[in-house]
Amino acid sequence: GIGGLPMIEATDGDYRERGPRRISPFFVPASIINMISGHLSIKYGLKGPNLAIVTACATGLHCIGAAGRLIEYGDADVMIAGGAEATVTPMTMAGFASMTALSERNDTPETASRPFDLTRDGFVLGEGGGILVLEEYEHAKARGAKIYCELVGQGLSSDGYHIAAPDPSGAG
């Protein structure tokens, strides 16, 4: 969703403490989220569409949907798609806390995450990732691949309500 935030924070500390000459020449490329897919492309010789999407918590799902559409449109036979996030840092926690976006159920963390409950009071920040290999159906059949599921569609929407809060009615 954010991409490279821990490195950005660490590099900012280096800059402030040791000056601009101590900044790694890899800082900018490493902070750009599409560099992960670029490195995979170079390492494994992958050719074809290569892009990165940033849509906060929905990034991984939107990447999978976009990959499915590229296959559907005939732009690729196989796509690697998904997302990963590792931004539990002091600055991230402070930012979400200042928005009052984090759950305050600190005494009962096992019940703090309840996104669809009427008594929800925020979210629980976490880290994780998930990657899928998507393949055009006939292409997979031709090579004898075991097919686990079929992606038949995806919906994208914005509720046009608030910068961080969902529309209470669920519209959008």
Specify the residue positions occupied by each region the protein language model found.
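Short, intrinsically disordered, charge-balanced linker/junction segments flanking boundaries
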Residues: 1-2, 16, 168-172
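Acidic, glycine-rich active-site loops and adjacent beta-strand->loop/helix elements
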Residues: 2-3, 55-59, 83-88, 153-158
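Beta-strand segments within the central parallel beta-sheet cores of soluble alpha/beta enzyme folds
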Residues: 50-55, 76-84, 146-154
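Fold-level recognition of mixed alpha/beta catalytic cores in primary-metabolism enzymes, strongest
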Residues: 84-87, 93-101
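Condensing-enzyme catalytic core mediating Claisen C-C bond formation in acyl metabolism
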Residues: 107-172
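Short acidic, glycine/serine/threonine-rich loops at helix termini
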Residues: 7-11, 64, 89-95, 161-166
